Amino acid sequence: MSFEGKTITCKAAVAWGAKEPLSIEDIQVAPPKAHEVRVKVDWSAVCHTDAYTLSGVDPEGAFPIVLGHEGAGIVESIGEGVINVRPGDHVILLYTPECKECKFCRSGKTNLCSKIRETQGRGLMPDGTSRFSCRDKTLLHYMGCSSFSQYTVVADISLVAISHSAPLRSICLLGCGVTTGFGAVTHSAKVESGSTVAVVGCGCVGLAAMQGAVAAGASRIIAIDINADKEVYAKKFGATDFIDSSKVKDLVQYVIDVTDGGVDYAFDCTGNVTVMQQELQFCHKGWGKLCVIGVAAAGKTLDFRPFLVVTGRQVLGSAFGGVKGRSELPNFVDEYMQGHFKVDEYITNEEPLKNINKAFDHMHEGKCIRCVVDMNKP
């Protein structure tokens, strides 16, 4: 049965308000308009960014909304003017779009794209409206993806077609966490072979940064976390050292001592500005670089003595790992399919859509790296 041009009713996890459990609802998903694509979402992962918005501290957070931004599925139908995908294509949703036409895309200096940023930040499609409704109420879109719905509508620049042979259960992770961490090392910071690298925070993004450091040829990869249980994961993804920071009185001095002056690169995957300050201090004088990946809570600022940067240290940031989704993700998928790139290893838990709140519980318990949600099991 074809739903092309028709509204679809499906299951979705709706966030009606901040700090409230997600509610499984029957929602209506309108057909795609010009330059839009409707996707049947098969798998979605749960990310700390979803929890950040649900907590109510996200300045762009608004409700009611369909969260989720780490998803993969199959194109159901396309709107007028769509030429980059067609019905039946397997796709990864992209919260960082790539129009290839705006000032940012043409600069060659960033993976950020400005074309739909304003409306995406307001939870709307590029024309300023929503394709979701429930109980006669309009639902907002999330990060241009809304993967916690069995069907979603996205801009045609917010997804990329990938190999049909790639398992959607795994490659949905490339929509955020894995790409974000890996690319921060290889694309944003451009770590050189032989470097000493510190990764602070051993969740999915941090582990992916370690995988990136291995690929870059780093000679020493120091994983740092307050949870000693993360050591086994860190070593699995390439860490040569593990520091349980909860047991170290002066982390800055400790890292400086064990690295002969500090690290060449530090990657923050915590979003904690106090930790970021420590990381900058244990970057090596003269050339050490701090790459901030973790997103701090609204209103938080990073304070440091200018002397730290005057003497050669640098601070940079990374969004989606500096990776251009439409141009580069297909190659990531191919590398995974050839056995050269870890993805499956990040998945520690799986839940059906009806248990999505349990997926969030797994994430908060600290034992989960990534929990994937089977959207076909409502």
From Swiss-Prot:
Keywords: Metal-binding, NAD, Oxidoreductase, Zinc. Binds 2 Zn(2+) ions per subunit. Zn(2+) 2 binds at C99, C102, C105, C113. Zn(2+) 1 binds at C47, H69, E70, C176. Its cofactor is Zn(2+). Transmembrane segments: none annotated. Oxidizes long-chain alcohols and, in the presence of glutathione, is able to oxidize formaldehyde. Also acts as a S-nitroso-glutathione reductase by catalyzing the NADH-dependent reduction of S-nitrosoglutathione, thereby regulating protein S-nitrosylation. Belongs to the zinc-containing alcohol dehydrogenase family. Class-III subfamily. This is Probable S-(hydroxymethyl)glutathione dehydrogenase 1. It comes from Schizosaccharomyces pombe (strain 972 / ATCC 24843). The lineage of its organism: Eukaryota, Fungi, Dikarya, Ascomycota, Taphrinomycotina.
